[in-house]
Regions:
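Short, small-residue-biased leader/transition segments that mark boundaries at the very start
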Residues: 2-3
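Rossmann-like NAD(P)H-binding beta-loop-alpha module
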Residues: 7-17, 123-159
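Glycine-rich FAD pyrophosphate-binding loop
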Residues: 18-36, 161-172
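Short hydrophobic core segments
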Residues: 25, 81-90, 139-141, 206, ...
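N-terminal Rossmann-like dinucleotide/flavin-binding domain of flavoprotein oxidoreductases
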Residues: 34-83, 185-205
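Conserved beta-strand-loop-beta-strand element in the redox core of flavoprotein oxidoreductases
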Residues: 65-85, 121-128, 211-245
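FAD-site-proximal beta/loop scaffold in flavoenzymes
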Residues: 103-135, 228-303
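A conserved FAD-binding loop/helix module that cradles the flavin
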Residues: 147-151, 157, 296-324
């Protein structure tokens, strides 16, 4: 099993309960993947992860931390002596912005910030250049779970002010009549972090960044309107009159999603086909294009919910068992 992330742990438990020997390789120093270093403690207490890991160990799952498959251990070495390899490494290739000033110091992807903050809370050393919101004016670009996680962390660190910025129209309080099931409901979502503070901004387009001596000082943007959106559901933004904005900031966190799996050596060595969405292609039995190599979770589906990854991991484990039986 490559990765102790959500889907990997679920698949491991499914297989060990069927009598298979399972070893999970994790590149980080501790187990849990995004549960450990991505989701903040105020949403998920780490003792809950540790309790599940203790259960898995008691059931017979073996773990190896600090081992990155593809670098510390090649796929060929891994396949030698095992019947199946499962890739469950997630989808953490960041979506970026190509805007003027993007290179300025003070602009970071959200996940490195969340990882560092999780390590701080756990009393662990922080790796790489420090990313902190303490005493800073923060802008978070994005409007989903990750941006809310950044907001909660920034407030807890003692940020001077925090803006969560989204370019889409202000969501309605109730589901739109034109957006019926199974389409994703476009409604106002207020997370616990939003109730703690910060300012939420919609209909705000970021145009670039300004700085001094290589350091970020301002976010440049403009406000937009969506004429007829409430009646038609069609998004056609037009600049709002007098809507230019120059926002004084010290830290910008990009929480605008992910574009697929990371371009790791494990995928190059495995030969597993990667589709147009940047995720691993599989058949109905979770098998990749390489015999003996399977994949599941966000590595296949793209960034998704915790419960979805767990369900996918269990289904993958059942499919691998059926193949090996």
């Amino acid at each position: 099993m490559c990765s102790s992330d959500l889907a990997g742990l679920a698949a491991a438990q499914q297989l060990v309960r069927q009598g298979h020997g399972v070893t999970v390789f994790e590149r980080d120093d501790r187990l849990g993947g995004i549960l450990r270093y991505g989701i903040p403690d105020f949403k998920l207490e780490k003792r809950m992860i540790d309790r599940r890991l203790e259960q898995l160990e008691a059931e017979g799952v073996e773990f190896a931390t600090g081992v990155e498959v593809g670098r510390d251990l090649s796929i060929d070495e891994l396949k030698d002596g095992v019947d199946a390899v499962i890739l469950a490494t997630g989808a953490q290739r960041h979506r970026d912005l190509q805007l003027p000033g993007r290179e300025l110091d003070g602009i970071h992807f959200a996940m490195p910030y969340l990882i560092q903050q999780n390590r701080r809370v756990a009393g662990l050393p922080v790796e790489g250049p420090e990313i902190t919101a303490k005493g800073k004016r923060v802008a978070i670009l994005g409007g989903g779970d990750t941006s809310a996680d950044c907001l909660g962390n920034a407030l807890r660190e003692g940020a001077v002010e925090v803006h969560e910025i989204a370019h889409g129209p202000t969501p309605p309080g109730e589901r739109e009549p034109l957006k019926t099931w199974p389409e994703w409901p476009v409604v106002m979502r207020t997370y616990a972090a939003h109730q703690e503070g910060g300012q939420r901004e919609w209909q705000f387009v970021t145009d670039g960044f300004e700085g001094k001596d290589g350091r970020l000082t301002h976010l440049v943007g403009h406000r937009v309107e969506f004429p007829g959106y409430a009646e038609t559901g069609v998004r056609k933004p037009v600049p709002a009159k007098g809507g230019e904005v120059l926002l004084e900031v010290d830290l910008v966190l990009l929480a605008i999603g992910f574009t697929g799996t990371e371009e790791d050596d494990v995928y190059v060595q495995s030969g597993a086909a990667i589709g147009e969405r940047g995720t691993v292609e599989i058949d109905a039995g979770y098998a990749t294009s390489t015999p003996g190599v399977f994949a599941c979770g966000d590595a296949v589906r793209g960034a998704d919910l915790v419960v979805t990854a767990i369900a996918d991991g269990r289904q993958c484990g059942a499919a691998v068992h059926a193949t090996l039986a």
